């Protein structure tokens, strides 16, 4: 179920504060955040946000196509190494 339009998009206050400061100072360094649940706003376009994936911060360059999605969608938390090969297929 999607979030109500009446409520508006969710964004952590501390992340919004960091984004506003980066916009004001025209700073190009990545903004570190642990807030995977925050929605990407149009103000974020052109910035690099380092999103935590549980182990490290993954730099995500925000483009216009990402607006409306959550930051966590762009920093994967699981690494798929592939299924184990069957012994029958090896012969």
Swiss-Prot record:
Disulfide bonds: none
Source species, domain of life: Bacteria
Cross-referenced PROSITE patterns: RIBOSOMAL_S19
InterPro entries named among the record's database cross-references: Ribosomal_uS19, Ribosomal_uS19_bac-type, Ribosomal_uS19_CS, Ribosomal_uS19_SF
GO MF terms, alphabetically ordered: rRNA binding; structural constituent of ribosome
GO cellular component: cytoplasm; small ribosomal subunit
Keyword set, alphabetical order: Ribonucleoprotein, Ribosomal protein, RNA-binding, rRNA-binding
HAMAP family: Ribosomal_uS19 (MF_00531)
Function text: Protein S19 forms a complex with S13 that binds strongly to the 16S ribosomal RNA.
Similarity annotation: Belongs to the universal ribosomal protein uS19 family.
Protein name: Small ribosomal subunit protein uS19
Organism: Azoarcus sp. (strain BH72)
Gene, per the UniProt record: rpsS
């Amino acid at each position: 179920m999607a979030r109500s339009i009446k409520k508006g998009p969710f964004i952590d206050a501390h992340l919004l504060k960091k984004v506003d400061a980066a916009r004001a100072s025209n700073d190009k360094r990545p903004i570190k955040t642990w807030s995977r649940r925050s929605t990407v706003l149009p103000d974020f376009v052109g910035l690099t946000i380092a999103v935590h994936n549980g182990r490290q911060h993954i730099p995500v360059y925000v483009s216009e196509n990402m607006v409306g999605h959550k930051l966590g969608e762009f920093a994967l938390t699981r690494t798929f190494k592939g299924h184990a090969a069957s012994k029958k297929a090896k012969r």
